[in-house]
Regions:
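Glycine-rich FAD pyrophosphate-binding loop
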Residues: 23-41
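N-terminal FAD cofactor-binding segment of flavoenzymes
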Residues: 39-74
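Short beta-strand to alpha-helix junction loop
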Residues: 88-108, 221-226
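FAD/FMN-dependent oxidoreductases across multiple families
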Residues: 141, 224-304, 313, 320
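C-terminal helical "tail/cap" subdomain of flavin- and related membrane-associated enzymes
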Residues: 306-364
Length: 364
């Protein structure tokens, strides 16, 4: 049976950040995650991620192939006027990223660091007085002192003692388009509120455009999942999204493929418990409207790693306790901002999507 000081489940940004720090601190850690099969997608990486990327030595991975500097955010929210910025927040430059490619670059640095990885899932866990036994999907067992769960929204270590609380049914319906060679698009983010939810567009590296509709899964029109024409029809009714797409020569009805991804707010009842620390979406997956999820993933991966170091080298759980407190405070702050964001849209107060978001979230 293999013995490891730490096992990390999941190779998203939180898991890889955790693995990077543990490797640098001389901790014998094993990264457990199957090969990524996520469809090509793009996301916004908040300026808040900058210091974490520097800490990890990853800031240099942001280049023309992986990231575009965001040149501004625009919104139609609260009324039909197009305005610069979102919800009176201070606007600072972030990045529009090709997440798949950026994470592949991050994985290459871990390989260069000598981080061990097995490309399969963890199937079963059993706790003892000294740690956790992990049974991998290939049948091999691993014993570890500490387990860091970065497995995403599934939070595979959750169970009867640690539950996942979902606050909504938000889902992202999106597609990525390749723009014609003669099209020049400015890398800006555009968000527009509509009765069924909200639209989002963002330019990606490689002259590609991501277009997404965020709504609740039970509010999707019948047949929506197999009919891009319905998606295009909804977009045609927007104030700013439709003109933006038309100016770029885009036809949503000709979407190469329509993808669906869970985007609901889900939080584990415990972020830290004996022998287990949760990070990234396994700790808390938050509404993407605030565009801060990836920065939080990097931060939590770093802090989870520092918690592991404290526990393993000094038998000191102080950092783990502080990590959980800071994360919970961040969740509460996010939910307060989230409630204010949705409350600032008054045009659709009778629509189910908006009625569900009148708050307070923790009492829903």
């Amino acid at each position: 049976m293999t013995e490891r000081q730490a096992v990390i489940l999941g190779a998203g940004m939180a898991g890889m950040a955790c693995a990077r720090i543990l490797s640098r601190r001389g901790i014998d850690a094993l990264l457990v995650a199957p090969p990524s099969d996520v469809a090509s997608r793009g996301e916004t990486l908040s300026f808040r991620a900058g210091p974490y990327l520097e800490t990890l030595g990853w800031h240099g991975l942001l280049d023309a192939e992986t990231a575009l500097v965001n040149q501004g955010s625009y919104s139609v929210w609260g009324n039909r006027a197009l305005r610069r910025g979102m919800f009176h927040q201070e606007e600072m430059s972030g990045w529009h990223i090709d997440r798949y490619r950026l994470e592949a670059r991050m994985a290459e640095t871990l390989e260069a660091d000598g981080v061990d990885r097995v490309f399969c899932e963890a199937r079963q866990f059993s706790r003892s007085e000294t740690g956790i036994a992990v049974e991998l999907a290939d049948g091999s067992p691993v014993n570890t002192r500490l387990l860091v769960d970065c497995s995403g929204r599934s939070a595979v270590t959750a169970g009867p003692a640690v539950t996942l609380r979902r606050l909504d049914k938000l889902v992202a319906c999106y597609s990525v388009f390749t723009l014609d060679e003669d099209v020049e698009a400015i890398p800006v983010t555009l968000v527009e509120a509509v009765a069924i939810g909200w639209w989002y567009t963002s330019l990606l590296p490689g002259s590609r455009m991501l277009v997404g509709l965020f709504t609740d899964s039970d509010l999707l029109p019948a047949g929506f999942r197999k009919n891009a024409g319905l998606w295009a029809d909804l977009a045609s009714q927007t104030t700013a999204i439709s003109p933006r797409l038309s100016s770029l020569g885009m036809d949503l009805a000709a979407a190469p493929e329509l993808h669906f991804a869970a985007a609901s707010t889900v939080t584990a009842s415990e972020l830290v418990e004996p022998f287990i620390i949760r990070a990234g979406d396994a700790a808390s997956a938050l509404d993407p409207l605030a565009a801060n999820g990836l920065a939080t993933a990097l931060w939590s991966g770093i802090q989870a790693a520092e918690s592991v170091v404290g526990l393993l080298t000094q038998n000191d759980g102080t950092k783990a306790v502080q990590y959980q407190q800071q994360f919970l405070q961040g969740i509460a702050s996010h939910l307060a901002v989230q409630t204010a964001m949705y409350a600032s849209e008054h045009r659709f107060i009778d629509a189910p999507f908006w009625q569900r978001r009148r708050g307070p979230w923790l009492e829903n």
